[in-house]
Amino acid sequence: MVPGPPESVVRFFLWFCFLLPPTRKASCDPRDLKSCNRPCVWSRLLKPNSSLSNLETAYFPQILRFLRPWYFSRSHLNYHQKAPARWEWLYSIYRKGTKAQRRNVLRSPCAPPQPSWPCSVI
């Protein structure tokens, strides 16, 4: 069984990437997130020559789709009960799935299944 991401990781990610202001004034070019001087993984993910592999970059939106409902799981307890199984399913396909399974996960519009509550952004 694969454990879900710890709550401290989500808190740190939100605090580090979105809540901290830039450390110095810089011109913000929307095409280059590094010019905003935000120490965030987004700039690395959007660069073609990033240190992350293509597979990790492709699965990052899928993992974020999981983290978004997981972050609100305390107020949505019935959804929280399904979350560990979904995380384990996504992780098993990411690590051990065949190419066809990975392709289907990335192409299907609702993979993994979306929550019943209408929240599109964190």
Curated annotation (Swiss-Prot):
Signal peptide positions on this chain: 1-28
A GO cellular-component term linked to this record: extracellular region
Keywords, ordered alphabetically: Glycoprotein, Secreted, Signal
Main location: secreted
Positions annotated with a glycan in the UniProt record: 49
Compartment annotation: Secreted
Protein name: Uncharacterized protein ZNF22-AS1
Source organism of the structure: Homo sapiens (Human)
